[in-house]
Each structure stands twice: as structure tokens, then as C-alpha cells.
């Protein structure tokens, strides 16, 4: 599992809600898990702040997980990013997506503290990244989810998802070329034992 925060948050409430559920609330493989879409949209629309909402997702390599785990994860994640707040102080909408070949638990949070009406910033990269990363690592260990920090899953080259296809292919080709250069050739490997055998009678160690 990975935790992603999207670079969004400006504009009206209809944008994120329509994306998650479809304009007519008929998006395929989308399911409302928690919250009231219309209430969330209304809170976003009522905001006078430049960044009106925070959006992101918990993304899993697993195609599905038990329903009780989903709700436990949502509860735990809210406790992590809303530390010190009660549930009546914030609004958080959760929508499940499964249309990309993986499970995503998407969240949208109006950046408003409900009791005071003051600005709420649930995630600030510089201050909160370490805490959220620690939460993610703990959940992956606890539930056995696929872990992006597993060395076996690290790519030899990190590529931006939005690169043009031909650029991605070129980058992959370069990566494969360098990998071959780093690997000892069969000819060189075959020669090494002969050198040792040739030196064996000369007393060299």
C-alpha cells in the first residue's frame, strides 16, 4: 500500500465529487464507503480559502481486501492525520475505486474545522510526511500488504507516470543497457579460473 496526496484543492466541490463518483453518480467500479458527497461538496463550496480541500488515496497492489480491514484502515488513517481532533470537527469522504486493476480508497477532505469554521490543513508535507510514512509502513507490516519499500519492488530507474510513451521506452532501454554493462560477461567469468590455474604453480596467493 502507498499513500498519495494529490496536487489539487482549488475550485468548487463538484470537481472532486464528480471525479470520484461520476457526474451522474454512475462511475463504474466506484463505491461510496463513508460520508455524504453533497455535504462534502457544500463544505468545499462554502470555503473562502485558496486551497479548499485535500484529496488523495490509499492505493493497493492487492485487488481487494476484506471490508472490515477497509473500515479499520479509514479509521486509523483519520486518527493519523486528524490527531487531536474529534470526528465532529472534520469531514472526510471515502470512495472506493477498482477500475485501474488495483484497489484505491480515495478521500476528500474540506479544509475547514467544522466547529470553528477556521482553516484546517490535514496534511503539510514538511511536517507530516514522516508520520504518514510511518503509519503506512506499520499497516503494511500488520496486514501483509505489498510494500513499496521492499527492495525487490524498487525499480532501477524511477520514471514519471506522465512521460510520453516513446520517452518511457527510451529510458527503459538505457536502463537495460547499463544493467548489461554492469553484469560481468560470460567470457570474462570463464577466463578467471584459467588465470588462477596458471598461477597456481608459481606460489602466488
Curated annotation (Swiss-Prot):
Region (Disordered): 142-205
Skewed-composition ranges (Basic residues): 189-205
Keywords linked to the UniProt accession: Plasmid
Coiled coil: none
InterPro entries xref list: Endonuclease_MobA/VirD2
Pfam families: Relaxase (PF03432)
Compositionally biased tracts (Polar residues): 155-174
Note: Plasmid pJD1 is the smallest of the gonococcal plasmids. Its function is unknown.
Name the UniProt record assigns to this protein: Cryptic plasmid protein C
